[in-house]
UniProtKB/Swiss-Prot annotation:
E.C. number: 2.6.1.-
GO terms classed as biological process: aromatic amino acid family catabolic process; lysine biosynthetic process via aminoadipic acid; tyrosine biosynthetic process
PANTHER family the record matches: AMINOTRANSFERASE, AROMATIC_AMINOADIPATE AMINOTRANSFERASE 1
Keywords: Aminotransferase, Pyridoxal phosphate, Transferase
Protein name: Aminotransferase swnA
Function comment: Aminotransferase; part of the gene cluster that mediates the biosynthesis of swainsonine (SW), a cytotoxic fungal alkaloid and a potential cancer therapy drug. Swainsonine production occurs via a multibranched pathway and is dispensable for fungal colonization of plants and infection of insect hosts. The first step of swainsonine biosynthesis is the production of the precursor pipecolic acid (PA) via conversion of L-lysine (Lys) to 1-piperideine-6-carboxylate (P6C) by the aminotransferase swnA, the latter being further reduced to PA by the reductase swnR.
Family stated for the protein in its record: Belongs to the class-I pyridoxal-phosphate-dependent aminotransferase family.
InterPro entries: Aminotransferase_I/II_large, Class-I_PLP-dep_aminotransf, PyrdxlP-dep_Trfase, PyrdxlP-dep_Trfase_major
CDD domains per record: AAT_like
Enzyme superclass (EC): transferase
Pathway: Mycotoxin biosynthesis
Necessary cofactors: pyridoxal 5'-phosphate
An example molecular function term from Gene Ontology annotations: 2-aminoadipate transaminase activity
Length: 493
């Protein structure tokens, strides 16, 4: 069976290599228009429209009308007249950064007022340019809009595309926020098997080829976290993405690419921010980043979600979504009557940082600094795992992106293991989790992320970015190792 699986996988990859030029997709020309997705829209999308009251504000006129139509308090009633922000030394920003009444580009009166659902024009333009430079989507009519973070964006996209009772596709282990959002909307999740490169193309193709349409219509939304996958830390290779994209084309899937860890690379050199010619720091960054589904997308079937939460601060509640203009327009209609655009003060902070202070070069330097810090922490945690987790019982893979280690514990090594004990994995997970907490370390249970129960292994996710103290990385792993060893009655080091 395993050999048949590998042969099928090899055939699929050969098929992909014949149809997708992995190296040149970025620069293929001429670019076509995106597909239309009317046949993939939910009932809610078909009934959703733009707010006529808010649209009235956008109506172009030759002069500024007297504003008596929309209930927007005039700026003279706001209790603030300026904002001042000071960046850290590592951010290398122009300090202080201020926002006052009457500033030409983005004054505080605009920041504190209701805003267009796409967000600040200047800030959106910055993220759109970043997307063009890094991903260069190979079709014409793509666009970018702001979001209130990835979780909010994913929630809206699921509402846009799916009706209650539908199924979506996702990795066998995936982000809990998406699982909860799907369940809240009455959706089911079909798990797709994974290997050391992430999603398995053959399993995805087989699940779709042999889907039982008597239970529901065939899934057409694939949710994936391709870089520094949460929770496993896996990063999909370009060849793997190309294989998955080929299947998406074959089965007319929409790919929801959730990529908050894309910029957090953990391999390479981070020793200096001074980049010698011929490459700028941004160009060097671009060449070091993984490919994306968006960069392979010729038909507009990828909906890419980026976030500032993992690279700046989660409290900003701001990110950006890139997709075909049709999808972006529908997304903005949903956002307008839902979460609306991100907070105005958050947009001001990002505008001052990205547009007025950093630019693309400064952004690249910041990511270089952040990735270097995270790489050092990852290396400390990997060394601690090698020293303190029971050998032969615990395994893990060194991540090349992101912020997580996925610890796998072999359940068959437990003295009470029996194939007939269906609940042993969850029972043991609970005991290790509680014992670790009693020893003073908090970890994440693997079952929180698993779409379907795993009966022969126990998993825990740990992160190397949450603590401010480097010593906590080794001490935390040491305490987790003690909890595992005690629950397994394991005396070997």
């Amino acid at each position: 069976m395993h050999l048949e699986f590998e042969k099928a996988h090899d055939v699929l990859l050969e098929d992909v290599r014949d149809t997708v030029n992995i190296r040149q997709t970025h620069f293929s020309s001429p670019k076509r228009l995106a597909n239309r997705w009317d046949h993939r829209l939910s009932d809610e999308s078909l009934s959703q429209g733009a707010s006529p009251l808010k649209n009235s504000v956008k109506t172009a006129t030759t002069s500024v009308p007297i504003p008596l139509g929309v209930g927007r308090p005039a700026s003279l009633f706001y209790p603030w007249q300026s904002m001042t922000m000071t960046g850290t030394k590592e951010s290398n920003t122009r300090n202080p950064m201020t926002c006052n009444i009457g500033e030409a580009a983005f004054d505080i009166s605009s920041a504190l007022n209701y805003a267009d659902p796409s967000g600040s024009t200047e800030l959106v333009a910055c993220f759109r340019e970043n997307t063009r430079l890094i991903h260069n989507p190979p079709y014409q009519d793509w666009d970018t809009t702001l979001t209130c973070g990835s979780t909010s964006a994913i929630d809206i996209v699921l509402r846009m595309l799916c009706n209650r009772g539908d199924w979506i596709l996702a990795e066998a282990s995936t982000y809990t926020g998406t699982v909860m959002a799907a369940k809240a909307h009455g959706l089911n999740i079909q798990s797709i098997e994974m290997d050391e490169e992430g999603l398995l193309p053959v399993d995805l193709d087989n699940k779709l080829r042999y889907w039982d349409t008597s239970r529901s219509r065939k899934p057409f939304v694939l949710y994936t976290i391709p870089s520094g996958h949460n929770p496993t830390g896996i990063t999909q290779s370009t060849a793997r993405k190309a294989a998955i994209y080929q299947i998406a084309e074959r089965h007319d899937l929409l790919v929801l690419e959730d990529d908050p860890y894309f910029f957090l690379r953990l391999d390479g050199s981070f020793s200096s921010l001074d980049i010698n010619p011929p490459y700028s720091s941004f160009e060097k960054l671009r060449k070091s980043l993984p490919s994306s589904y968006l960069s392979l997308d010729k038909s507009g079937r990828v909906i890419r979600v980026d976030s500032t939460s993992k690279i700046l601060a989660p409290g900003l509640r701001c990110g950006w979504l890139t997709a075909s203009k049709q999808i972006v327009e529908i997304f903005e209609n949903f956002a307008e009557v839902g979460p609306a655009p991100p907070s105005g003060p958050s947009q001001v902070m990002l505008y001052k940082l990205f547009v007025e202070s950093w630019g693309q070069e400064g952004f690249a330097n910041w990511l270089n600094h952040l990735s270097g810090e995270y790489k050092s922490r990852r290396d400390i945690m990997i060394a601690a795992c090698s020293q303190h987790l029971p050998k032969g019982l615990c395994t893990w893979t060194t991540p090349t992106h992101g912020m997580f280690l996925w610890i796998t514990i072999d359940l068959a090594r437990h003295p009470d293991y029996s194939e007939k004990r269906e609940n042993l994995s969850l029972d043991l997970e609970d005991k290790i989790y509680e014992r670790a907490a009693s020893y003073g370390v908090a970890v994440a249970k693997g079952s929180w992320f698993n779409v379907e129960a795993c009966l022969d292994k126990v998993f825990f996710r740990i992160t190397f970015v949450s603590t401010t103290c480097l010593d906590d990385l080794e001490n935390g792993v040491k305490r987790l190792g003690a909890a595992v060893r005690d629950e397994f009655r394991f005396t070997q080091a």
